[in-house]
């Protein structure tokens, strides 16, 4: 789920993108 949402959230929220990339 995080992988799919990560792509969508990454564009909307850069902070979440960085957090997901680190995880």
From Swiss-Prot:
Tissue: Expressed by the venom gland.
Chief subcellular location: secreted
Keywords (A to Z) from UniProt: Allergen, Amidation, Antibiotic, Antimicrobial, Cytolysis, Disulfide bond, Hemolysis, Secreted, Toxin
Parts forming coiled coils: none
A single GO molecular function term of this UniProt record: toxin activity
Membrane-spanning segments: none
Summary of subunit composition and partner proteins: Heterodimer with M-MIITX-Mp2a (pilosulin-3a) (AC Q26464); disulfide-linked. Only heterodimers (and not monomers) have been identified in the venom.
Similarity annotation: Belongs to the formicidae venom precursor-01 superfamily. Ant pilosulin family.
Entry protein name: M-myrmeciitoxin-Mp2b
Native source organism of the sequence: Myrmecia pilosula
Organism taxonomic ancestry: Eukaryota, Metazoa, Ecdysozoa, Arthropoda, Hexapoda
